[in-house]
Amino acid sequence: MASCVGSRTLSKDDVNYRMHFRMINEQQVEDITIDFFYRPHTITLLSFTIVSLMYFAFTRDDSVPEDNIWRGILSVIFFFLIISVLAFPNGPFTRPHPALWRMVFGLSVLYFLFLVFLLFLNFEQVKSLMYWLDPNLRYATREADIMEYAVNCHVITWERIVSHFDIFAFGHFWGWAMKALLIRSYGLCWTISITWELTELFFMHLLPNFAECWWDQVILDILLCNGGGIWLGMVVCRFLEMRTYHWASFKDIHTTTGKIKRAVLQFTPASWTYVRWFDPKSSFQRVAGVYLFMIIWQLTELNTFFLKHIFVFQASHPLSWCRILFIGCITAPTVRQYYAYLTDTQCKRVGTQCWVFGVIGFLEAIVCIKFGQDLFSKTQILYVVFWLLCVAFTTFLCLYGMVWYAEHYGHREKTYSECEDGTPEISWHHGKGSKGSEDSPPKHSSNNESHSSRRRNRHSKSKVTNGVGKK
């Protein structure tokens, strides 16, 4: 009996692995102050589900067939999200509430299943489904069929430049601000930005709207819109890194204003992680991981344009911008989980949200290829090969630049994990070194707490206490 029990005992490495994976896949809420919002309500949800199903099944008018199908689909989505709240993992985030991120994961699973379903339809069936969702799509036209691109590029006037600052330029700016908040690296953001412009050049023979004048591509896109967004996002990152996070209970706040501020701050991060994608001793494994990250990022961006070109809907249509918002929501936990997998030796598998995101990206590409065979038959294979080589080359340049910066200026900036954080799995220093690093100096990990405290004492600008910022 004793030997049987002993065989079930987990080793220390297995325990550490499970703890580290759980912190990125099933993050726990610490210091719960209002138990009601975090206590399981399974019986309540079960009762609500049964009662609501009985009510809608026996009281609604089912004389309109199309209305029955539409309401049935919405009900399936709604109750699938309820199951998501009960059964799916939290992911790496807990703010404003883990249930929100469980529903985000549930929506990503639904979208994944929907893409699988599309693969078994023909093009006419997919178009019929789109016309059922929005009859106006019958009259939609491709932007490339009614607009001209890269015309009279030698004519550069102030009026023409100002005319390019439209809603899409605004979207570029804020989109890159959000991307910078997720990636948190100047070098990687600039590399992805420049690589995307190269991607447009290499795929211009398939998508005519990728054609741009040089001043539009270099000055307006890369420098102003993308660069401004990256700068704003990184400024916010640095601000959040400098804060000391201490969250008090609602019960300890006695003023109405303080309670309101604490409630609003519930929608802000519980802590902030300083990330470091590259290290001076980065191995090939980490370089390859960042290269794969950039390829999937570019693929996801390409899917946006191929989907609306093949299935013919405008960029302003809800099918386009709703997908962009949805992809943005699932990208946040995906990047966090992928970074942990790439840099943490104790994390030996990717998180579930990261896995689903990768499958979605490749499934969208497969859907585009299946239903756009006429378009992809014009593909110049040499351009695609050059594109892959350019991404690899820019990844190497990014690595070289970030390593050079770390060697010359890294000593001025001690890395640290999240300020009073509960997620040590993605901090840079570990007792056994970092994944993808051939030799991580153990002396930093032994003094990590002192380095972190000294940095906070020297640079901290504000402190969040009881939900109220104090200078």
UniProtKB/Swiss-Prot annotation:
Pathway: Phospholipid metabolism; phosphatidylserine biosynthesis. One of its GO terms (cellular component) is endoplasmic reticulum membrane. Signal peptide: none annotated. It is a multi-pass membrane protein. Inhibited by exogenous phosphatidylserine. Residues 2-35, 94-102, 182-186, 238-286, 331-355, 402-471 are cytoplasmic. It catalyses: a 1,2-diacyl-sn-glycero-3-phosphoethanolamine + L-serine = a 1,2-diacyl-sn-glycero-3-phospho-L-serine + ethanolamine; a 1,2-diacyl-sn-glycero-3-phosphocholine + L-serine = a 1,2-diacyl-sn-glycero-3-phospho-L-serine + choline. Residues 426-471 are annotated as: Disordered. Keywords: Acetylation, Endoplasmic reticulum, Lipid biosynthesis, Lipid metabolism, Membrane, Phospholipid biosynthesis, Phospholipid metabolism, Phosphoprotein, Transferase, Transmembrane, Transmembrane helix. The keyword ATP-binding does not apply. The keyword Acetylation applies. It is found in: Endoplasmic reticulum membrane. The modification N-acetylalanine is found at A2. Its EC number is 2.7.8.29. The modification Phosphoserine is found at S417, S440, S452. Catalyzes a base-exchange reaction in which the polar head group of phosphatidylethanolamine (PE) or phosphatidylcholine (PC) is replaced by L-serine. Catalyzes mainly the conversion of phosphatidylcholine. Also converts, in vitro and to a lesser extent, phosphatidylethanolamine. Belongs to the phosphatidyl serine synthase family. This is Phosphatidylserine synthase 1. It comes from Cricetulus griseus (Chinese hamster). The gene is PTDSS1.
